[in-house]
Amino acid sequence: MTENGFRVEADLLGKRSIPDDAYYGVHTLRAKENFDISGRTIASLPYLVMALAAVKEAAADANCELGLLPRPYRDAIAAACVEIREGRLHDQFVVDVIQGGAGTSTNMNANEVICNRALELMGHARGQYEYLHPNEHVNLAQSTNDVYPTAIRVATCFALEHLLEAMARLRDAFAERADAFAGLLKLGRTQLQDAVPMTLGQEFSTYAVMLTEDIARLQEAGWLIREINLGATAIGTGITAHPQYAEKALAALRRITGLDLSTAPNLIEATQDCGAFVQVSGVLKRIAVKLSKICNDLRLLSSGPRAGFGEINLPPVQAGSSIMPGKVNPVIPEVVNQVAFEVFGNDLTVTFAAEAGQLQLNAFEPVIASALFRSFSHLTAACTTLAQRCVSGITANPERLRETMERSVALATALNPYIGYKRATAVAAEAHATGKSIREVVLERQWMTDAQVDEALRPEALIRPRVL
């Protein structure tokens, strides 16, 4: 019954007025009022909203196949879920991402939105739950405790694939620059001190390899997250569900999502354990560590332009100072550094929340989901931004690379096989003290011939193993 643009819905706490145009109901309204915490609603996590709809559609399919849900109910529920999976009605998911209750508010938000849209499709008004009910039908044979973690895992799979794509593009950008810089000899450094020669191409190919390795680690974590507890219901015993429900719901969810999901071998363990989230978050932290290290290098190698390393140029994307004319800052690597710092904190949040579970349930999966999806989203954006607005436009300064190479006393290392470590040390010390080149000092001491020095300092001999 509606009046003045509102309908009345009731729960165990009493009656409340719900806006007529709202697809959510009384449970969602109370949760919206209770959890004004982060300013981020479930709608800000589109993968989670789509995953919730996929789980509800799979449940309806399974229950219908088992004869527990009439076909017209199943069809209306499934149609509503398809609309949500296609991006509609996301604005109706209004509960804060961070909430008490182990995700019950999120589950009920989904139940009510799906139910009210299904009612419309059946020719009824929103809130006419005598024809289709959020709990009795949309949530049939389900608990928040299997729906919510399953939805998080499915959403994580979606987010993971997009991050993998962004990482692959960044890896390819570094590999392309490595090819372009393959012939540019430069000085390597350890502990910020002159070390031995390498090519700029080798330096950039290292970044591509780092990303390749982390892509593999993320793919491995993705297999772990594909194990779900749908059918566990409240604590893993499967109470209120048909004996074949878990199997049929899994098959439906695999079909709907296209994911290679599996049911956990022990549903009681799977319902209370958050180890898979810890594992995935740890891999995200590893990726963030690598990205931040790479960006530290890019900032250092491009420092200057006249009083720093100045070996590479980052593409200028904006003016760098409100007071210093002409200054350009490495803003893209800097923003990636900051994303990494955020991911480190998110990983700690996941760790604490996973540890805080008690007995048969972890009540803190909402903050785990919040932290995980923020890390996924920001890392994906960071990889894309770094590839498109920085790495693809990096250029080298060959003259600067040559200058630092020729002036470095570290070239004395290449003399070890010819004159031994002791004499090579003496050559390096004299070159450093006098400003002479390594070539000049070793020839003056007559410890090597011109031909031997040429061979020792030949670029190809400086950057890879060889037999003398």
Task: Report residues per predicted region.
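Conserved, well-structured ligand/cofactor-binding cores
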Residues: M1-L468
